[in-house]
Amino acid sequence: MGRLLAIDGLNIVRRVYEASPEPDSDLKAEIALRHALSSFRNLITDHQPTHVLPAFDFGGATWRHQLYAGYREGRAPMPGVLREALPEFYQRLAGFGLRVVSLPDVEADDVIGTVVLRWLAEDRGAAVVATTDKDLHCLVAQGALVWDHFKSEWHDHAWCEKKWGVPPEQLPDLLALMGDATDSIPGVSKVGLKTAAKLLRTYGTLDAIMAGAGILKDTLGETLRKEREMLYLSRQLVQLKTDVRVGVSWNMLAWESA
């Protein structure tokens, strides 16, 4: 059986870059990408994959911006020196034997979701996603495992339930309810993690919650009814797009160990 390692590329690159307190500079970018390359190598050494998917955001507007103009409006842009250094970094990854996938109009999350689900559907073996991004943890429900490279820990079904109070299959509904400030996804006013998790444990799904909201006489019921449209828009925004035309074959992602 095979083993797919999907790497959320910018999740690693940006965290390494931002961990350094120095001001933005070409030297800072060079050092950060050198460390990021070591992280990629360590991931491959530690997980011994048969296939590797290094996925990176292409940049610019995506299908989510078309749905909601305010998407990610509060997120700080990538430092220019780091963005300018990425093409050379991709070349270094290619020289290392990796096939970088970076597609316009979609995010790396969508590419990873598409490829991981296809891999699992074809029963090709284990799928590991190297990321700290909460959006990708919904893939745990389909049989993937998430690896936090920075904490060296596995995130499985039990970890997700302990962290968020719901199983991974309910994570998109949870994020839709509570919103996600990182991506400027509004969610429902004054609904935080605990309230969102309690609603999902009680009702099970977003649709069931909204059906029940019709008889709730308290402020929460009123808010849910009032913000129904934004809630379902938020649900679309947090949902992974899993039908991306990735344009690579399994052979292109195959990893030949030295």
Model-derived features: where do they sit?
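Acidic, divalent-metal-coordinating active-site segment for phosphoryl/phosphodiester hydrolysis
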Residues: K134-D135, K194
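Noncatalytic, basic helical substrate-engagement surface that gates or grips nucleic-acid strands
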Residues: G2-A130, L136-E153, E229-L233, Q239-S257
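Non-catalytic nucleic-acid-binding/docking modules located in mid-to-C-terminal regions
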Residues: P49-L53, G143, H155-A258
